[in-house]
Amino acid sequence: METKKNNSEYIPEFDKSFRHPRYWGAWLGVAAMAGIALTPPKFRDPILARLGRFAGRLGKSSRRRALINLSLCFPERSEAEREAIVDEMFATAPQAMAMMAELAIRGPEKIQPRVDWQGLEIIEEMRRNNEKVIFLVPHGWAVDIPAMLMASQGQKMAAMFHNQGNPVFDYVWNTVRRRFGGRLHARNDGIKPFIQSVRQGYWGYYLPDQDHGPEHSEFVDFFATYKATLPAIGRLMKVCRARVVPLFPIYDGKTHRLTIQVRPPMDDLLEADDHTIARRMNEEVEIFVGPRPEQYTWILKLLKTRKPGEIQPYKRKDLYPTK
């Protein structure tokens, strides 16, 4: 299903097996999303919000993970508030995906009028100075759209990704990501291809919030709890001679607009130790996500790795027991 260019770049390829009847359901889903993407957002967003909330009630394991994460990160919020955040998260997810599909099908000129950049001058200055850049991007639902927009404007982009479980969805999703150019690097291939791309002038896209286990990670504060955070961005900025720029997209289903927030480069990381780097990474996530928690992918096992002697929260039977 895939080929490699220069032993580093992942290029999705159509496989003849995708025509098999076992994948027809997946193709129907792809066709449905394409049709929805061509529908004006003022009509599709309310429908997608209702469908998303409904799916969020059915997906009990995903909902449980999200509620556990929120209970540890925001213990000061009431149960009703956390439930509302999860509902809005599930509403936001299909809305953001539909905008991504619309961008791929109709092109950037159709969605640019609904995109607001905050801090665009930071990006423009680095482009003028021909600087190497790695964007630090918390895992939000609209995470791919800013990279696609920058690629559509001629900026070479490179990102790492995990394969989807369904090969048809994996093929379509990554084809959409590469719609306007750029490079994709499979995480299974390691970090070196990504480093090579950034050194060659591609702007990197790095998601800082996944749990990579205890090895090489630092236990640092994350909202009201703590998280095993890999301080790799500090090494990457040195090896690539790149500046690290925090970025976060926010999709508003009521206004049908995407706001892309860009914060000043994290130049303070150059001389920082691993613990400080890890904490600064989490601080940027908190700054972006705190005001708009529904934008974040709380369904991930963000807090899987715990300190010795502490039970993984998702295995605790006292936290949101399944019925």
For every predicted segment, state its role:
Residues 129-188, 214-221, 225, 255:
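Catalytic core of membrane glycerolipid acyltransferases/transacylases, capturing the structured
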Residues 2-19, 83-87, 124-128, 152, ...:
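Non-catalytic C-terminal accessory region of glycerolipid acyltransferases
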Residues 2-137, 170-172, 181, 323:
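Membrane-anchoring hydrophobic helices of lipid-metabolizing enzymes
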Residues 31, 65, 121, 145, ...:
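Short Gly/charged-rich anion-binding patches and loops
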Residues 116, 185, 263:
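General small-molecule cofactor/ligand-binding pocket signal
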